[in-house]
Amino acid sequence: MMEIQMDEGGGVVVYQDDYCSGSVMSERVSGLAGSIYREFERLIHCYDEEVVKELMPLVVNVLENLDSVLSENQEHEVELELLREDNEQLLTQYEREKALRKQAEEKFIEFEDALEQEKKELQIQVEHYEFQTRQLELKAKNYADQISRLEERESEMKKEYNALHQRHTEMIQTYVEHIERSKMQQVGGGGQTESSLPGRSRKERPTSLNVFPLADGMVRAQMGGKLVPAGDHWHLSDLGQLQSSSSYQCPNDEMSESGQSSAAATPSTTGTKSNTPTSSVPSAAVTPLNESLQPLGDYGSVTKNNKRAREKRNSRNMEVQVTQEMRNVSIGMGSSDEWSDVQDIIDSTPELDVCPETRLDRTGSSPTQGIVNKAFGINTDSLYHELSTAGSEVIGDVDEGADLLGEFSGMGKEVGNLLLENSQLLETKNALNVVKNDLIAKVDQLSGEQEVLKGELEAAKQAKVKLENRIKELEEELKRVKSEAVTARREPREEVEDDKIPMAQRRRFTRVEMARVLMERNQYKERLMELQEAVRWTEMIRASREHPSVQEKKKSTIWQFFSRLFSSSSSPPPAKRSYPSVNIHYKSPTTAGFSQRRNHALCQISAGSRPLEFFPDDDCTSSARREQKREQYRQVREHVRNDDGRLQACGWSLPAKYKQLSPNGGQEDTRMKNVPVPVYCRPLVEKDPSTKLWCAAGVNLSGWKPNEEDSSNGPKPAPGRDPLTCDREGEGEPKSTHPSPEKKKAKEVPEADATSSRVWILTSTLTTSKVVIIDANQPGTVVDQFTVCNAHVLCISSIPAASDSDYPPGDMFLDSDVNPEDSGADGVLAGITLVGCATRCNVPRSNCSSRGDTPVLDKGQGDVAATANGKVNPSQSTEEATEATEVPDPGPSESEATTVRPGPLTEHVFTDPAPTQSSSTQPASENGSESDGSIVQPQVEPSGESSATTSSAAPTMWLGAQNGWLYVHSAVANWKKCLHSIKLKDSVLSLVHVKGRVLVALADGTLAIFHRGEDGQWDLSNYHLMDLGHPHHSIRCMAVVDDRVWCGYKNKVHVIQPKTMQIEKSFDAHPRRESQVRQLAWIGDGVWVSIRLDSTLRLYHAHTHQHLQDVDIEPYVSKMLGTGKLGFSFVRITALLIAGNRLWVGTGNGVVISIPLTETVVLHRGQLLGLRANKTSPTSGEGTRPGGIIHVYGDDSSDKTASSFIPYCSMAQAQLCFHGHRDAVKFFVSVPGNVLATLNGSVLDSPSEGPGPAAPAADAEGQKLKNALVLSGGEGYIDFRIGDGEDDETEEGTGDVNQTKPSLSKAERSHIIVWQVSYTPE
């Protein structure tokens, strides 16, 4: 701890050791320590050191702690600034990532939909393949069952074949034994036979029966060559009747297989098949199977010739087979001699002939064939015929000879009977097996067919369900299309409401559409939150103005404690507050400054202990608020008066003597001398204090000569006069979007000089909107005023007269049809949907009027009725119809250039004009009694001209209202008459004119483009709608840049070519999408852009769209008027204009700033920012550095034109006007004029300059000067040097200060301020 050292003389040395070793104390703590030291010194001098002995250590500790806290606070502030910058960068990165995520989500939704569609298709294919697989499995199962049955049948047939083969072998052996016995009998009885030949012939026949005992048991089939029992006639007949009664038919292969299994075969019968009985006739006739089998019904129609042919062919086959078997038998006998004896017997007996004969039965009903037993070689048919036709003696002969072989006949007959029974049983079994197998095969076939039919039925049902769903969808679509067509044909008032539409007919949304709706809803929510934030921020600023006590937290508790302790009697006077110098930085576009200012102001406002009163109810609160305002303005006045280092002239705060070296030498720039002089400041309307100003525009009379106006054809434009290249202010151009006089050559219009200073000002009350016309040379005199409509008029623009340099009416079609690949046939131009009229613009009006479906706008008459479909509808003043149509083929009267190709899909917008009001038909002279006696009538109107001859080909004024109405009035005569009017889709926010095209910006993000007709008058019945994007946002501002139009759309700027209606370029004016472009001002090669709720102005190149410069006006305003007073810490730009070689800036708190435009800008580091292209700079060697020199157009040989000038500006040369408004500056308007008769330049000179040698030069320079009048409008008026209260007392005259004032004082009414500025045109 430091102690106090006392010397003999009573001197005190305080902190002597700490000054050498301690750290540097802050300025505030050192001031406090010095004050405390002097106070302690006085106490010690008056009393004794004992008084401060115990107090001194405590004070030292407090001061040390205060110093440490201040240092920590400064460190925390630095860290806070760094964190805020990081936070802003993170916010920007977050917005970027958020946008990327939205894009990714959209793509994901699209991919998901595509995958679902593909998955559905694959699922359908899988189901189809499964169905086919089930069918194939069923077929394979049926085939496997058939194969197994066929294998079983094959095994059974093999077994039967083996049994038959064994039986055949036994029969051959028996036959051989019979042959041997017969030979032995023949050898033994040879002598007897030779003795009597007739007797032998008679006894041979019974012998033949005894020798062949099996003849009646086994017979051979004539056709197939297989053994068939002879007594099977009953079986064949019954089987035939069974098959004919059941009408059953089996396939050929199954019949052949059953025939093989039902008959016994010999080894010699290879490749043959047994016959199946197919006829119900009771006979033993069979049909060979080597021929093609016929159905059951076909056998009755077979002719006898076919049967004879088959019998002959079969007989030859049987002969061959019999000879073969006989040869085999002869081989088995072993002796040719023995066989020769047998052959002699067979040859001598005609009944044993081998060849069969076909003969008829006795009844003659059916033919019978002889059955030849090939194994025995006996013709049984001839024997049977002989026995059947012979008498009883033959039978007796047989009986007599039967005892020759008695010992063998019993055994043969028994064997024959057994074989016959066995064969019958086998035949029955085989027949039953055949029927069973046939039935099983048929059942299998039918079951397979049933499964296939079931599958086909299921597929048909699925297809039926799909088709039914498709039919339902098509029916719903048809109903929806019909309802849309009916709705489109009806009037808007007859549209069907959504609750009347059935649920089945309502539209069903897909996932993509639902996602789009959700995204739009989120965007609307963001915009709503943004608007709420802006409203809350505005209310806070207004509350900060009305309640300064909320922000006044100046002294801490320690200060209050010490002030009560040491200065209880009286408070010391406040010390003069020193303001640090403000450095102006030109930085890249960022929103960090705005965020810091907003957070700082919110912290200040939220520091109040009581809630803010936005809506006071009683008069006491109003008077208290007025007193608080006066106190605030008084503080601003003190700050302005105490601000040293700047000059004050003509109501402007000028910078100190600032000399800027021009590029060609070291002479001083004379622009600083041309200070605007305020010439007028009064309320616009004295009688109505509630009138509010909205917008204004000067009358542009370029290209119009009143002495050449014709009542039928309109005024003829001046040849060679271009509205975009002529002198705007010399001819009355007021708009900030039009060029200033310094960038164009002067063109004189003597007829229009007297009236080019007229200004139309739009005012509004609670119920109506009015137009107040004044002359800027005499701003105190109202030329005329009239009511426009009941809604607020948001914008106004002066449109010049028709000119030869205007675009022809048909150019917008010709340019769009020249390059089809550029414009596209689908009506989309550069990502923007193009909508236009369906009729060609070059068709004369007489041709257009012949169409019954297109209303015709009669521009010259006041009594116009709306026509629709040939019927007059007087109750409907204006209608709007929109229909998507294809541009029709041009008729014979149209030019050939329009028949290149079909036009794009366009939107034909046609309207009927609103009937003119009855009051508008009165001449302007009749309304002279409504105004003062000093009202000046227009001098350009001829005395003999009637109100009916006013044409829109002359200069006009276009007014856009909030309810979507667009009004066109004449700018030269009969102002009250509305020439044209049209109802657009949304509010009209901005109007510009480019070479015969008027672009109207709407609040729904679309541009309406109007053009003139063939007679030079404006055609509002046909126009084009240009959509700038989705989702829709308002187009807040537009500016004409050469022959292009810059549109402020959200945070972007779209450069539009009005001739081709295409977007040539789009760029971001601000990195954050929530920000909006609000004002645009163009001159030369530069365009100044302002952003909503931002204090930074941005300069862009007019051709390359390069970002050139940033200027922040907030530090300048805070330095001039004091930080934190009246909410001036938050500065937003509300008005912007380039006029008189100056950039005029109006802020939201009523401050007017004028910044001279310079060719070069020297930054705070000495860096040169810009150069004139046709001049040489002494610092051109440094131009290679980045940001050193901006490339511009032009060369040494070319003349000085506007395209070689970039409007840089420096806040070091900025000038602040002490005349301002209480609320936001609504508008700036510049018109030519000269209120002051002579302008004495010595008034504007600085005190240090002498008038001696420079006076002749100033006089010579004054002859080249041009004069312009700049008007500003806003609510209220204030002089920052005087403050609030004193001016009211002066204006009210001799009156008591305490008397009750009206609710709205004179200083709070809407004011206009007029400055006259002199400048040297380029």
UniProtKB/Swiss-Prot annotation:
Protein name (Swiss-Prot/TrEMBL): C-Jun-amino-terminal kinase-interacting protein 3
Annotated GO MF terms: JUN kinase binding; kinesin binding; MAP-kinase scaffold activity; mitogen-activated protein kinase kinase binding; mitogen-activated protein kinase kinase kinase binding; signaling receptor complex adaptor activity
Region (Disordered) location: 183-211, 245-317, 704-754, 844-952, 1281-1307
The entry's keywords: Cell projection, Coiled coil, Cytoplasm, Cytoplasmic vesicle, Golgi apparatus, Phosphoprotein
RH2 domain boundaries: 506-580
Modified residues (Phosphoserine): 315, 365-366, 588, 662
Gene3D superfamilies recorded: 1.20.58.1770, arf6 gtpase in complex with a specific effector, jip4, YVTN repeat-like/Quinoprotein amine dehydrogenase
Composition bias, Basic and acidic residues: 724-750
Quaternary organization: Forms homo- or heterooligomeric complexes. The central region of MAPK8IP3 interacts with the C-terminal of MAPK8IP2 but not MAPK8IP1. Binds specific components of the JNK signaling pathway namely MAPK8/JNK1, MAPK9/JNK2 and MAPK10/JNK3 to the N-terminal region, MAP2K4/MKK4 and MAP2K7/MKK7 to the central region and MAP3K11 to the C-terminal region. Binds the TPR motif-containing C-terminal of kinesin light chain, KLC1. Pre-assembled MAPK8IP1 scaffolding complexes are then transported as a cargo of kinesin, to the required subcellular location.
Localization terms from the record: Cytoplasm; Golgi apparatus; Cytoplasmic vesicle; Cell projection, Growth cone
Organism annotation: Rattus norvegicus (Rat)
Region (JNK-binding domain (JBD)): 210-226
Function: The JNK-interacting protein (JIP) group of scaffold proteins selectively mediates JNK signaling by aggregating specific components of the MAPK cascade to form a functional JNK signaling module. May function as a regulator of vesicle transport, through interactions with the JNK-signaling components and motor proteins. Promotes neuronal axon elongation in a kinesin- and JNK-dependent manner. Activates cofilin at axon tips via local activation of JNK, thereby regulating filopodial dynamics and enhancing axon elongation.
Domain RH1, first and last residues per copy: 12-100
Coiled coil (UniProt feature): 66-167, 443-534
Pfam assignment, any one: WD40_2
Taxonomic superkingdom: Eukaryota
Region entry Interaction with NTRK2, spans: 459-515
Region (Leucine zipper-like domain (LZ)) residue spans: 424-459
UniProt gene name: Mapk8ip3
Compositional bias segments (type: Acidic residues): 1285-1294
Polar residues: compositionally biased ranges: 271-282, 914-937
Cellular component aspect of the GO annotation: axolemma; axon; axon cytoplasm; cell body; cytoplasm; cytoplasmic vesicle; dendrite; Golgi membrane
Modified residue annotations for Phosphothreonine: 266, 276, 287
Family: Belongs to the JIP scaffold family.
Region (Kinesin-binding domain (KBD)): 50-80
Post-translational modification comment from the UniProt entry: Phosphorylation by ROCK1 is crucial for the recruitment of JNK.
Main location: cytoplasm
